[in-house]
Curated annotation (Swiss-Prot):
<dbReference type="InterPro" id="IPR037124">
    <property type="entry name" value="Chaperonin_GroES_sf"/>
</dbReference>
<feature type="modified residue" description="N6-acetyllysine; alternate">
    <location>
        <position position="86"/>
    </location>
</feature>
<feature type="modified residue" description="N-acetylalanine">
    <location>
        <position position="2"/>
    </location>
</feature>
<keyword id="KW-0143">Chaperone</keyword>
<feature type="modified residue" description="N6-acetyllysine; alternate">
    <location>
        <position position="70"/>
    </location>
</feature>
<keyword id="KW-0346">Stress response</keyword>
<feature type="modified residue" description="N6-succinyllysine; alternate">
    <location>
        <position position="80"/>
    </location>
</feature>
<feature type="modified residue" description="N6-malonyllysine; alternate">
    <location>
        <position position="54"/>
    </location>
</feature>
<feature type="modified residue" description="N6-succinyllysine">
    <location>
        <position position="28"/>
    </location>
</feature>
<feature type="modified residue" description="N6-malonyllysine; alternate">
    <location>
        <position position="40"/>
    </location>
</feature>
<feature type="modified residue" description="N6-succinyllysine; alternate">
    <location>
        <position position="86"/>
    </location>
</feature>
<dbReference type="GO" id="GO:0005759">
    <property type="term" value="C:mitochondrial matrix"/>
</dbReference>
<comment type="subunit">
    <text>Homoheptamer arranged in a ring structure. 2 heptameric Hsp10 rings interact with a Hsp60 tetradecamer in the structure of a back-to-back double heptameric ring to form the symmetrical football complex.</text>
</comment>
<keyword id="KW-0007">Acetylation</keyword>
<dbReference type="InterPro" id="IPR018369">
    <property type="entry name" value="Chaprnonin_Cpn10_CS"/>
</dbReference>
<keyword id="KW-0597">Phosphoprotein</keyword>
<keyword id="KW-0496">Mitochondrion</keyword>
Amino acid sequence: MAGQAFRKFLPLFDRVLVERSAAETVTKGGIMLPEKSQGKVLQATVVAVGSGGKGKSGEIEPVSVKVGDKVLLPEYGGTKVVLDDKDYFLFRDSDILGKYVD
């Protein structure tokens, strides 16, 4: 997974640090997919979360995901963060489209 790299970075407020899942490079039938046809990876694993953001009433609202959750991301957005030569992405909690439930 993310190893120790994410421990060097703590998201603030309602920010969520995620590690995108690897794109499928081979079909179930064993056909290798070229990079152009793989599509954008929209699934990720949460590796760190902030403490939450201020709500309308001024109270701190906790982030809706926790470390280890599998989430669905928007096609565009997020801020790329490189930690120990590995790419992570920083999103606002409200930008995350949903989380996968086992």
